[in-house]
């Protein structure tokens, strides 16, 4: 019986790029809490002893950006110079400009050529769902995130006190070529920053027994499963001291782990007038509802936009041969049941709220948090009825 391998990865909240994402989204949330109509593109760079805040912000909100950045870094766990990055001691520089009026006139209702609220930029966005996990996410990315959440949990509650904030996980999964179903887990890679006091064998055993095995389905772990734990043998220096971190550098971790294409636009630090974020969320909402409705077991949707124009320039759907109805019919149903204009997306998913900080680590999709409206399956019944199933 033929098989194939597929791999996805996740990173912890202490990974330098994720530190940057979380600072950017914390600043976005602080602004939206006061000014829901603000225009925000908040970028962050973190390096040894340094946090740089830059981008374009147009708002009436009064926010202490430096305080928000320090509080976010501290919450992640970088609160001591021993860790190489200290929330209280690092320098924080603020370099925000305002949004270009040329862009603003294309987004503001009643301005520009299209008087509706237009897209904040051109671009293409994808959404995906499949039936491999309870939250309709691909297996490898779903469980990579769960491993990283488990590492954070054991670090923060003191059960493994020698853990430090930076970590990465990677899963290689074996699929049956005929059924497309997960057969077993081939390789688990988990690298975690740690105190210098802990020995390698103690660390390796604790990671396997207390992080990996409680998270991964035991029936998919076999005698052949390979465990690669801190494969270099040492990971003391990490976080922003080990690598420079930037907002928007973990876009595959943020989405589907490579199981679906990506349009290239990052999410964190962007208000929902930016279709890079809001339309990608809407695409996930569409794909998840199609799979939840039983119209397909796999669904990928692409939408595209032109700057300043409200209506999508294209909508396409691929169900990879699993659809119960044609893809043309699915597109018709999507147009009837989902408003994919920028303003429609914001209203449909209630996006003008300070809900984004939680999304900045452990994935934007496949987490049934109350704030994550794009994970609801409230359109599934109507889609199924309209499809005549």
From Swiss-Prot:
Binding of K(+), residues: 43
GO BP annotations, alphabetical order: one-carbon metabolic process; S-adenosylmethionine biosynthetic process
Keyword annotations from UniProtKB, A to Z: ATP-binding, Cytoplasm, Magnesium, Metal-binding, Nucleotide-binding, One-carbon metabolism, Potassium, Transferase
Root EC class: transferase
Catalytic reactions on record: L-methionine + ATP + H2O = S-adenosyl-L-methionine + phosphate + diphosphate
Pathway: Amino-acid biosynthesis; S-adenosyl-L-methionine biosynthesis; S-adenosyl-L-methionine from L-methionine: step 1/1
Superkingdom of source: Bacteria
Needed co-factor(s): Mg(2+); K(+)
Gene Ontology CC annotations of this record: cytoplasm
Pfam families noted in UniProt: S-AdoMet_synt_C, S-AdoMet_synt_M, S-AdoMet_synt_N
Matching InterPro entries: ADOMET_SYNTHASE_CS, S-AdoMet_synt_C, S-AdoMet_synt_central, S-AdoMet_synt_N, S-AdoMet_synthetase, S-AdoMet_synthetase_sfam
Residues the record lists as binding ATP: 15, 166-168, 234-235, 243, 249-250, 266, 270
Annotated cofactor note: Binds 2 divalent ions per subunit.
Annotated GO MF terms: ATP binding; magnesium ion binding; methionine adenosyltransferase activity
EC number: 2.5.1.6
Region (Flexible loop): 99-109
Binding residue positions for Mg(2+): 17
Function: Catalyzes the formation of S-adenosylmethionine (AdoMet) from methionine and ATP. The overall synthetic reaction is composed of two sequential steps, AdoMet formation and the subsequent tripolyphosphate hydrolysis which occurs prior to release of AdoMet from the enzyme.
Family per record: Belongs to the AdoMet synthase family.
Protein name: S-adenosylmethionine synthase
Natural source organism: Neisseria meningitidis serogroup A / serotype 4A (strain DSM 15465 / Z2491)
């Amino acid at each position: 019986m033929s098989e194939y391998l597929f791999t996805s990865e996740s990173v912890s909240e202490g990974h330098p790029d994720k530190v940057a994402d979380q600072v950017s989204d914390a600043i976005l949330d602080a602004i939206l809490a006061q000014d829901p109509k603000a225009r925000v593109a908040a970028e962050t760079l973190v390096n040894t002893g340094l946090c740089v805040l830059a981008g374009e912000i147009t708002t009436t909100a009064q926010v202490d950006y430096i305080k928000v950045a320090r509080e976010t870094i501290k919450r992640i766990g970088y609160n001591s110079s021993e860790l190489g990055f200290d929330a209280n001691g690092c320098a924080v520089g603020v370099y925000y400009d305002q949004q270009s009026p040329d862009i603003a006139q294309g987004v503001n209702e009643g301005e520009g050529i299209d008087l509706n609220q237009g897209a904040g930029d051109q671009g293409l966005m994808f959404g995906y769902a499949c039936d491999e996990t309870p939250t309709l996410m691909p297996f490898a990315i779903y469980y990579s995130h769960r491993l990283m959440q488990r590492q954070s949990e054991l670090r923060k509650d003191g059960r493994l006190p020698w853990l430090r904030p930076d970590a990465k996980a990677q899963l290689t999964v074996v699929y049956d070529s005929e059924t497309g179903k997960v057969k077993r887990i081939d390789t688990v890679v988990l690298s975690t920053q740690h105190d210098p006091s802990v020995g390698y064998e103690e660390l390796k055993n604790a990671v396997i027994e207390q992080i990996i095995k409680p998270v991964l389905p035991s029936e998919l772990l076999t005698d052949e499963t390979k465990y690669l734990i801190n494969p270099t043998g040492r990971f003391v220096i990490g976080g922003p001291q080990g690598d420079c971190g930037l907002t928007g550098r973990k876009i595959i971790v943020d989405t589907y782990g490579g199981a679906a294409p990506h349009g290239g636009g990052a999410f964190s630090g962007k208000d929902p007038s930016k279709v890079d974020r809001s339309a990608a969320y809407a695409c996930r909402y569409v794909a998840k509802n199609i799979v939840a409705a039983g119209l397909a077991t796999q669904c990928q949707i692409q939408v595209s936009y032109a700057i300043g124009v409200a209506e999508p320039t294209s909508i396409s759907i691929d169900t990879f041969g699993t659809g119960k109805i044609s893809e043309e019919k699915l597109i018709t149903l999507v147009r009837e049941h989902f408003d994919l204009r920028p303003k429609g997306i914001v209203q449909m998913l209630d996006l003008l709220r300070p809900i984004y900080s939680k999304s900045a680590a452990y994935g934007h999709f496949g987490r049934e948090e109350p704030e994550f409206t794009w994970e609801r399956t409230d359109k599934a019944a109507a889609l199924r009825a309209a499809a005549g199933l």
